[in-house]
Regions:
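Cellulosome-associated attachment modules in secreted, modular CAZymes
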Residues: 332, 384-450
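Residue-level signal for pocket-adjacent positions within structured domains
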Residues: 26, 77, 151, 209, ...
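Acidic, Ser/Thr/Pro-rich low-complexity intrinsically disordered segments
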Residues: 30-128, 154-259, 285-383, 435
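N-terminal targeting signals for Sec/Tat export/insertion, comprising classic cleavable signal peptides
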Residues: 22-43, 400, 409, 415
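Predominantly extracellular/luminal regions of secreted and cell-surface proteins
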Residues: 9-23, 126-151, 257-282
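Short clusters of hydrophobic/aromatic residues that line enzyme substrate/ligand-binding pockets
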Residues: 21, 27, 31, 146, ...
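Sec-dependent, cleavable N-terminal signal peptides
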Residues: 1-11
Length: 450
C-alpha cells in the first residue's frame, strides 16, 4: 500500500502537479480503476525532436489517447497523441515522436485503457543537428549581419510550447561598392524553404521593398534555394529566409564580388560634377548598378580640354552585360550662360546600343568640352579612352623642343601671376592647367629624346 501511494505521488494527477522527467530518464507509474491517468512534464531548452515511449506490465493496457500538451493562455492544448505498436486504441507499448518541438514546457498525460499494473515512461530529446540563428530575428529591424564568404546556420519550423512557430529569419548585408551578390540556402531534415517567401529587400522611404525572390528546382519550395544579382549598388540589404513546410536546420551562404573595373569618382551625373579626363590614359567606370535605396546609375560625365586645334578620338567599351547608348552617349560644349549644348553622338555597329562606342572629329577648336557616357541596359564596368591633339612641348614656338622651352615655361610660371593658357603645347601633361607638373613632363620629353 505504501509503495502504491509513493508511486501515485511521483506520477502527478493533473498538469499542474505533473512530475518532471529529464532527458534520458525513465519514470515508473501505476494505473488501475482508481487511478486512470498519470501526468508528467518535460522542459525543452532548444529546438529538436522529442521521443516518448511508455510500456505497461501486468494486465494494464495503455490508451493511444495518451496525449502531449503545450500550454498557452494558461490552458493546455493538444500537441498530439501516442500511437500503439500494434493496437489501434490501446497497447502495452505506446510511443510519441515529434520533430518540430520548440522551447518550453510540455505536459504528458498517460491514460489507462484497461486492466491494472505499472508502466515505465522514457523520454529522449535530440537537438536539431544545426546550430540556431540569433533570435529574435523575425523582422528586418532585428536582423543579424552576414559577412561575405561566410556560412551561417539557423533553424525554422519548430513550434514552441505556447504555440508559436518560427517561420522566417531575417539577415542583412552591407554592400560597400558596386558588384554581384550571391546567396545559397540548404535545409536539413524535413524542412522545405519557400522560393517566393525567401526574398532580398532594399530599403527606401523608411520601408523595405523587394529586390527579388530566391529560386529552386520546385515552383514554390525546395531544400536548396539560391539568389543572384549582378547589378547591386552600395547600401544595406535585408534577406528573409522563409519556411514552406516541415522543420529542421539550414545553412545560408553569402558572397559579394566587386565589379572588376574601378569605380568612377561619384557624384558625376551632370556636367557640373564632371570628372577630369586626360588625353591618353584609359579611365574606368561603372554603370547600371542600383543602390539599396533604389537609385540606378545611368550616366557619367567627364570634362576634357583640347589644348590645341586638332583631331580628337574617343573609345568606350562596356564589360559584363553593360550595353551603352549610342544616342545618350555624346559630346557637349558649354554656352556663355553656363548651359551645355549638344555637339555629336557616339556611334556603334548597332542603332541604339553597343558594347563598344566610338567618336572621332578633326579640326576641333581649343577649349573645354564634356562627354556623357550613357547606359542603355545591363550593368558592369567600362573603359573610356580619350586621345587629343599631340602635345610637342614647343613652348617658345621656335619649331623644336629644347632646354629653352623649359626655361621659358619656368619664367612664365615664376614671373607671371597669370601664365598664358593660350600657348600651344604648354599643357604638356594634359591636365587642363599649367603647373610645375608640365615642367617635369617637358624635361621627361627632352630626356627621352622625343
Amino acid at each position: 500500500m505504501l509503495a502504491t501511494s509513493m508511486s501515485l505521488l511521483a506520477q502527478g494527477t493533473s498538469w499542474q502537479t505533473a512530475t518532471l522527467i529529464s532527458n534520458g530518464q525513465t519514470k515508473t507509474g501505476t494505473l488501475d480503476n482508481n487511478n486512470t491517468v498519470a501526468w508528467y512534464k518535460i522542459t525543452v531548452t532548444q529546438e529538436g525532436h522529442v521521443d516518448l515511449v511508455a510500456t505497461s506490465t501486468g494486465t494494464l493496457t495503455l490508451s493511444t489517447g495518451s496525449t502531449v500538451y503545450g500550454l498557452k493562455n494558461d490552458a493546455t492544448y493538444s500537441r498530439g497523441t501516442f500511437t500503439g505498436a500494434t493496437g489501434t486504441y490501446s497497447d502495452v507499448n505506446i510511443s510519441y515522436h515529434a520533430t518540430d518541438v520548440g522551447k518550453g514546457t510540455y505536459y504528458i498525460r498517460i491514460a489507462r485503457y484497461g486492466g491494472a499494473g505499472s508502466f515505465t515512461l522514457k523520454y529522449t530529446f535530440t537537438p536539431c543537428a544545426l546550430s540556431n540563428d540569433p533570435e529574435p530575428n523575425n523582422d528586418y529591424q532585428s536582423s543579424s549581419q552576414l559577412q561575405s564568404g561566410a556560412t551561417v546556420q539557423g533553424r525554422l519550423g519548430h513550434r514552441t510550447s505556447d504555440d508559436v512557430t518560427d517561420t522566417e529569419d531575417w539577415y542583412k548585408i552591407v554592400v560597400p561598392e558596386e558588384g554581384h551578390i550571391e546567396f545559397r540556402a540548404i535545409s536539413t531534415e524535413n524542412l522545405l524553404l519557400s522560393t517566393n517567401g525567401s526574398v532580398v529587400y532594399g530599403f527606401r522611404n523608411n520601408a523595405t521593398y523587394s529586390r527579388g525572390s530566391f529560386s529552386g528546382n520546385g515552383t514554390y519550395s525546395d531544400d536548396t534555394i539560391t539568389y543572384q544579382a549582378t547589378n547591386v549598388g552600395k547600401g544595406t540589404y535585408y534577406v528573409r529566409i522563409s519556411r514552406y513546410g516541415g522543420s529542421g536546420g539550414y545553412k545560408l551562404y553569402y558572397k559579394f564580388t566587386p565589379c572588376p573595373l574601378a569605380a568612377d569618382p561619384e557624384p558625376n551625373n551632370n556636367f557640373e560634377n564632371a570628372g577630369w579626363l586626360p588625353s591618353g590614359p584609359t579611365k574606368q567606370g561603372r554603370l547600371g548598378y542600383r543602390t539599396s535605396d533604389d537609385v540606378t546609375d545611368t550616366e557619367d560625365w567627364y570634362r576634357f580640354t583640347v589644348t590645341k586645334k586638332g583631331a580628337i578620338e574617343f573609345t568606350v567599351t562596356g564589360t559584363e552585360d553593360l550595353t551603352l547608348s549610342t544616342y545618350g552617349t555624346a559630346i557637349y560644349g558649354l554656352n556663355d550662360n553656363g548651359t551645355t549644348y549638344w555637339i555629336a553622338n557616339f556611334s556603334g555597329t548597332n542603332t541604339y546600343s553597343n558594347v563598344t562606342l566610338t567618336y572621332q572629329a578633326n579640326d576641333v577648336e581649343k577649349g573645354t568640352y564634356y562627354v556623357k557616357i550613357s547606359r542603355y541596359g545591363g550593368s558592369g564596368g567600362y573603359r573610356l579612352t580619350y586621345t587629343g591633339p599631340t602635345l610637342t612641348g614647343d613652348v617658345d614656338g621656335n619649331g623644336k623642343v629644347s632646354i629653352s622651352d623649359v626655361t621659358d615655361m619656368i619664367d612664365r610660371l615664376l614671373g607671371s601671376s597669370n601664365p598664358s593658357f593660350a600657348i600651344d603645347d604648354a599643357d604638356v601633361d594634359g591636365d587642363g592647367k599649367i603647373t610645375i607638373g608640365d615642367v617635369t613632363a617637358l624635361i621627361d620629353i627632352l630626356l627621352s629624346g622625343n
